[in-house]
A protein has these predicted regions:
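Alpha-helical substrate-recognition element adjacent to the catalytic core
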Residues: 1-119
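C-terminal cap/substrate-recognition subdomain and adjoining C-terminal extension
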Residues: 69-207
Length: 207
């Protein structure tokens, strides 16, 4: 019986990439989006890509970051899927290589129990181009999942994970149910549940 569900945020619980929305404000959307795609497809190290992309955001007003973070388009069925999993007695957690401004705000709207993500450094009301946090490396999600499983006394077989990109691979290594959601090929190959339609409720039919 499943007891824990861990969802990625960008392009999984949320329909898009938070950092790409930020970049559009600075007129560098295409450049940042290209780096994001390289990282999510596994062609570029996630840590390097994160530093590179956040560096390009230097000088962006934090008020704009907050406004965008609070108006993101959530994925079809996100709220309903989380509510249903919780009604089955599961803990639902969000792991994101993105940013706390988005995941913490979404927590209250979508209803997951906890979020682990990264923090954008801010000085004098503007982004400094630096980032820190729990989810900065390719191995971060896997490491955090193992820690959570140990704390909660939950096994791999009792764990469901859901994501779309290469930085989700490490958590796929520690879960019995592995959902590739509208995912890159590198992740699809490691999944035992594949969803190709942008509606998270489809997962409920498959578990």
């Amino acid at each position: 019986m499943l007891k824990l569900a861990v969802f990625d945020f960008d392009s999984t619980l949320m329909d898009g990439e938070t950092i790409d929305f930020f970049a559009e404000e600075l007129g560098i959307g295409e450049e940042v989006s290209r780096i994001t795609e390289e990282a999510m497809s596994g062609r570029l190290d996630f840590f390097e890509s994160l530093q590179l992309r956040v560096g390009l955001l230097k000088g962006l007003d934090y008020s704009i970051v907050e406004k965008i973070s609070h108006n993101l388009p959530y994925m079809n069925g996100a709220k309903e899927t989380i509510a249903e999993l919780k009604s089955r007695g599961m803990k639902v957690v969000c792991f994101s290589g993105g940013f706390r401004t988005a995941t913490s705000y979404a927590k209250d709207i979508l209803g997951y129990d906890a979020d682990f993500s990264n923090a954008l450094h801010v000085k004098d009301g503007k982004l400094t181009g630096l980032v820190g946090g729990d989810m900065m490396f390719n191995f971060s999600k896997g490491d955090m999942l193992v820690r959570l499983q140990n704390i909660l006394g939950i096994s791999e077989e009792e764990t469901l994970v859901c994501g779309d990109g290469a930085n989700d691979l490490s958590m796929f290594a520690h879960a019995g149910s592995r959902v590739a959601f509208c995912a890159r090929e590198i992740l699809r190959k490691e999944a035992n549940i594949v969803v190709e339609t942008k509606d998270l409720r489809i997962i409920l039919e498959k578990i």
